[in-house]
A protein has these predicted regions:
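A structural motif at transmembrane helix-loop-helix junctions in multipass membrane proteins
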Residues: 133-167, 218-219
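Aromatic- and glycine-rich beta-strand/loop motifs that create alpha-glucan
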Residues: 1-26
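Junction motif at the cytosolic side of a transmembrane helix
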Residues: 202-219
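Membrane-interfacial helix-loop-helix connectors in multipass membrane proteins
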Residues: 42-46, 114-135, 181-192
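Helix-loop-helix units of permease transmembrane domains in multi-pass membrane transporters
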Residues: 70-101
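Hydrophobic alpha-helical transmembrane segments that constitute the membrane-spanning cores
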Residues: 95-121, 140, 144, 178
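Long, hydrophobic alpha-helical segments
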Residues: 36, 51-68
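Hydrophobic alpha-helical transmembrane segments in multi-pass integral membrane proteins
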Residues: 170-184
């Protein structure tokens, strides 16, 4: 069993590496979008909340696109049957796959984040806090995206429908991430605890609902 699990991890890690080019392209597009955003608002004075909200929304859509592409490729009807017949429950496979997607997105964000913050005119003193908050919130975003992506690829919906379905669950993440600007007035550890708790809440039902959607709607 341990050998099979190690083989599963190795296989998913290999798929993650192969998908890194697509993730790199997405973050290059994020840099372009950030540049356009900054140029459009260069004559307007605003607080950190506006560029931070823009960044989180863009990360939200990048995650949706990434998760949906991975699921469309890895959960085709033939591959799905192989996963179902594997020694592990589909929920475990979904969990491992989501973690690999998360690591892929997170590593690229850590690489690009200093440049993105400079482009968005966000003080680099926020770099560590933003990276930690993004690392915690991205966990929830990926698992939320997996639920809607499993429905989308099954029913052949479009990405716009996926974003609408996911948006209500993303709103708390967006709202609480804005509190980073009040880091002096609040305990930043409370924000970390919230994002961790929100992830655990999503973890409780996300793999189950994703597995159900893949099994029931893909046939």
């Amino acid at each position: 069993m341990i050998k099979n699990f190690f083989k599963l991890l190795t296989n998913e890690f290999s798929l993650m590496i192969k998908g890194s080019i697509f993730t790199f392209v997405l973050f290059c597009l994020l840099m372009i979008a950030s540049s356009i955003f900054s140029l459009a608002l260069r004559h307007i004075s605003f607080d950190i909340e506006i560029p931070l909200a823009f960044l989180w929304i863009m990360i939200f859509f990048i995650s949706l696109i990434k998760v949906e592409k991975v699921y469309a490729s890895d959960f085709s009807e033939a591959k799905l049957q192989q996963y179902i017949l594997s020694p592990f429950a589909l929920e475990i496979i979904i969990f491992v796959k989501n973690i690999m997607i998360y690591l892929n997105l997170l590593i690229l964000f850590f690489i690009f984040s200093p440049i993105i913050l400079i482009i968005l005119n966000i003080n680099l003193s926020y770099l560590l806090s933003i990276n930690i908050l993004l690392a915690l919130s991205l966990l929830s975003i990926v698992f939320i995206s997996s639920m809607t992506s499993s429905i989308t690829i099954s029913r052949n919906n479009k990405l716009s429908i996926t974003s609408v379905l996911t948006l209500p669950l993303f709103v708390p993440i967006l709202i609480f991430s804005m509190a980073i600007s009040d880091v002096i007035d609040i305990d930043i550890n409370k924000l970390y605890i919230f994002f961790l708790a929100y992830f655990l809440l999503n973890l409780a039902f996300s793999p189950l609902l994703t597995s159900f959607a893949l099994k029931k709607l893909s046939v």
